[in-house]
Each structure stands twice: as structure tokens, then as C-alpha cells.
Amino acid sequence: MGKIIGIDLGTTNSCVAVMDGDSAKVIENSEGTRTTPSIIAFSDGEVLVGQPAKRQAVTNPKNTLYAIKRLIGRRFDEKEVQKDINLVPYNIVKSDNGDAWVEIDGKKMAPPEISARILQKMKKTVEDYLGETITEAVITVPAYFNDSQRQATKDAGRIAGLEVKRIINEPTAAALAYGIDRGAKDAKIAVYDLGGGTFDISIIETIDLDEEGQQFEVLATNGDTFLGGEDFDRRIIDYLVNEFKKEQGIDLTSDSLALQRLKEAAEKAKIELSSSQQTDINLPYITADASGPKHMNLKLTRAKLESLVADLIERSLEPCRIAMKDAGLSNSDITDVILVGGQTRMPKVQEAVKNFFGKEPRKDVNPDEAVAMGAAIQGGVLGGQVKDVLLLDVTPLSLGIETLGGVMTKLIEKNTTIPTKASQIFSTAEDNQSAVTIHILQGERQQASANKSLGRFDLSDIPPAPRGMPQIEVSFDIDANGILNVSAKDKQTGKEQSIIIKASSGLSDEEVARMVKDAEAHAEEDRKFQERIETKNSAESMINGVEKAISELGDEVTSDEKEKTEAAIKALREVMKGEDSDAIKEKTNALMEAASSIMQKAYAKMTEKQQSDDGAGTQNADHKEDDVVDADFEEVKSDKKD
């Protein structure tokens, strides 16, 4: 059985890990870094992923996609999506089914399709490291992701050519990595996870089961799927735009090139202010008007940054209060506080967490890597490499159906341990009602319309009867990934109807299949591209070697040999201008044949020279041997005292 890798599919950065013996190991990507920017760019027919995409973002803002995780599994009309439309340089559009998609060069693409590109890079990173094909993964999601977002993440995995063995909550994964690393011990851990685009808080209990191993049980979880480092960056960008407008009278908000440079500068300034009190923001030629080019030169202090984002930090504390209340714990019950996500490196965030929980957060957990490591450990559990670990996660939001009067009736309460099942008997609202519509909801509001609609289906052919008489059993079944299956059964007739919730905003099987084919086609394109490069490099090396041999041999090369070889080189250089690998290989072989006599002469000359050098070296060694003088020696002791 192959290894099951662990992937932290982040809003800003992604990370991949795999079990290496008894521990999880984060794998470096092809650029040599342990995290990969979750950025995809489309440039001149080429798809760039990670650092290469980030590097060209300033010059190609409309075709560079970042923070796509904030759109995954979301409807176009959601207020969070509408807010993002005005903040990003790329086009967010409404798909035929009402989803939020993106548009690049007139082509609409689904967020899972974009995220799949990042997952493919993570997959290839491990494949290059292990030297084997990877087909299975555990992928993490924010604990507060709803059913649609989880399903869309699973779709992204399928498109990337991965069987997603488990969807695991990010804070749970971090606690798993932390708990396994420090050994079995009873503890109650608060995981504060403030990433690039989402925020989660989970309260997790670890229990030492002696010979049976270690149990990780999530007691409560809460969060905000539209709060993260991107929002902190946006506050800095808005501040810079306003300051520049005051100074120069120019509004930069409609200049996508300037905004991309501001985004880059804001992120850099934010990082610098975690370790220094002040930073300079210098952006020459940020724009121009009739009077000439304009430059931005501003100082940003840590205090100013803290004032700009104070409400965002405060916003993260309300879910903490709710989670603690749901877990039935007080601050004194918490053993350890773990910080996860790059934004937790900000000193003001650390201070807020410390003040809230009344204890210093632990600094021995890498906030960028813990989630991927936990996912790899869960992969190890599922693959049988990691023994004696029991993980009990929860559903983050309540699940139920719409009943008479537009009310949501809950069947499964939030923070229920999964997998789980629940059933309830309902009846008809009118006399002789022959069908009922089961409308499935997720959320905490009493009013059905205020919650997230996950889907609906009909149970028909109910025998005529007075209202309230038929007995319809509705059953909810949540699997270990937090994905829901709902069924409704008429107790009298035994007729049953069921639905696996793929969410009204999910992709159809046909769409996923098409995207899988597209991804495979791109993988084949990438392979051919790599093959072309290697073939061209090999041809170039061959040309260099032959030209060097001709130069070194001089008059030893006959005019006929030289003429034949130069003609072969010219023919090879001509085909190297194209993209036909087979033609390049053919002309490379032709050059090898044409230059064979020259290369034989060059080899013979080199062998002769080596033998000559070896002979001279032996002679010198003999002379040195004659010069050796035998001598006695005695140790001279110093009178110096230490």
C-alpha cells in the first residue's frame, strides 16, 4: 500500500508532509522551500503555480489568482464573495449553477479546479522526494467550513488525481501533531488558528489510554471563514491608498498594477513589523499624472498597524468565547494554547490570545507546518503506519430540516462527535398530502432562510391521510469527513428516498470528470515540456562537446570530417528552434554519427595526455622518495604554566 500524504491546503500558503518512520516530515518543494504560495497564474499559455506565480503577480495581476480558498464551495451572491469582488484584481463571476467562479481570458473556472493545481504541485513534491506515485491524501480544511466547502475541497482532490481518504479540520491536525510529538499526556488544548483567509478555534482534549494509546477528542469548535491575514493586508493597503490620496490627490484603487504592488508591499511590511517597530514602504513610479511619475515613500509603525487591525483581532476572540462556553470549560481548565497560521506571528495577536486565555501561548509549534504534519499523521493512522491513535472530531455547525412556518428543526447539534447518525419522525402539514419536500439546512439560526441551504429532495406517493397522521422518518448520517447523507422514509409504505449532500453549490460528477481530464492533459503537457527541455539541453551539450573537440584537435580534423560535422550541427540547431522532441533526438543522433571519428580522436588524445600526466606524477613521487631523510626527534616540553 502506498503512502497517504498530508496536505494543508491554505489560503495564502500550502504545505505537504508524509510519515517518515515514526514521525511526520514536511517535504521541500522544487524551489527548496517548505511552504508553497497558494497562487496560480496563467501567462502566455503556461500555468505557473507557487513561487513562480507570485514572482510575476505585479506584472500580470488580472491573470494571477490568490486566496481562492475564500471562494471554494461558495455562492456568488453571498455577501462575503461580493465583498471580495471589489478587493481582488481578477474577475469573480457567477457560474451557471450560481457558484462563485473566476474568469481568465474569457474562460470560466471553478475554485476546486484552481485549488487542484496547488494540490498537484503538493502531490508532485512528495513523488519527487519518495520516487513513487502518490494517489491518496488527507487534506485539511478550516474547522468552520460548511458541507459545501468540504465537498468542494474533496472535488479539488479528485481533480488533482488524489483519492481523498479523509478531510480533517486544521486545528485538530495541529493538535494531533503537537500531541504526538510530546507523547501521551492528559491535557485540554486550545488551538487558535489564524491563517491567511480563515480563523478557527478548537478546544481539544487529549487522553492517555495507557496500552491503548492516545485519544484526541474535539470538545468544541468555532470560527470565521472570512477572517485572516488577507484582511490584515487589506487594512494596510487601504491605509496606503488613503495616505497617497492625501499627499498626491490620486486614487490608486482603480489601478490594478499599483494595487498588486501595494499588496506585495503590505505583506512585506506586516511581516517586518512582527520583529521591528517601524518599516519604510518605498514604491518608486507607483503611478503617474500630467506632471510626471509619482513615488510612494511612507513609514509604517507597529503601533499604527495594531490600530488598523485592532477590530480584526477582537473579532477573533468572540468565537473563542463561544467555543469555551460550548466545551463547558473555564480558562483555568486549559493546559496549553497552540498558535497555528502565519498571522499568529504578529505580537499583538499573541498578546490578545495570552490575555484571553490567561496563559502564554506555546512557541514550540511551527505555525506554518503543524497542520500538514497532523494531516500526515492521520494519513499514517488510516494507512496503518501509526498505531494507537484515536481521533474524535466534531461537526462545526448544526444540521436539520425546514419545518412548518419556515423554522429550522435541528437533528444534529453543532459540536457533535462524528461519524454520527440521528433520526426524527415528522408528518404532513395538510390533509391528503401526497408528497413532502425535505429541505436540508446547516447553521444555528431558528429561521430556516437565515441558514445555509445544503439541498432538497422529495418523498412522494404518500397514501392519502389526515394531516399529522403519516409517519415520515428523516435520518441524518455524517461520515468521518463531515459529509452528510440524508434519507426520508414513509413508515407505513416503507418507501424511502435519500440524497448524499453534494451541496447545491457543488460540482456535478460530469464537471469533476471533465476537470480531471483537463488536469491529466496538463500533467501530460508538463511532462512533454520537461522532455523537450531535457532533449534540447542534451543536444546543446552534444554541440558544445563536438565544437570543443574540433577546436582542441585543430589540424588533426580533416576538411571532410569538419564539413560533415558542421552541417550536422547546423541541422540540429535548426530543429532546436522548434518544439519537436523526436526531430531533435533524430538530429542529435545524426550529429553523433557525423562526429564519431572526431570524438574518437579527441578521446584518444585525452587518454594519451592522462597517461603522460600519470607517468610524470610517478616519476616525481620516486624523486621525492629519494629526498626523504630518516631522523630521530625528541619532545621539547615548555616551561610555561597554563
UniProtKB/Swiss-Prot annotation:
Q: Which CDD domains match?
A: ASKHA_NBD_HSP70_DnaK-like (cd10234)
Q: Where is this region: Disordered?
A: 602-642
Q: Which UniProt keywords apply?
A: ATP-binding, Chaperone, Nucleotide-binding, Phosphoprotein, Stress response
Induction remarks? By stress conditions e.g. heat shock.
Q: Which GO terms describe its molecular function?
A: ATP binding; ATP-dependent protein folding chaperone; unfolded protein binding
Which residues are annotated as modified residue Phosphothreonine in the UniProt record? 198
Q: Which InterPro entries match?
A: ATPase_NBD (IPR043129), Chaperone_DnaK (IPR012725), Heat_shock_70_CS (IPR018181), HSP70_C_sf (IPR029048), HSP70_peptide-bd_sf (IPR029047), Hsp_70_fam (IPR013126)
- Any S-S bridges, and between which cysteines? none
What family does the database annotate? Belongs to the heat shock protein 70 family.
Spell out the PANTHER family in the cross-references. HEAT SHOCK PROTEIN 70KDA
Quote the protein name from its UniProt record. Answer: Chaperone protein DnaK
- Source organism (scientific name): Dichelobacter nodosus (strain VCS1703A)
Read off the lineage from the record. Bacteria, Pseudomonadati, Pseudomonadota, Gammaproteobacteria, Cardiobacteriales
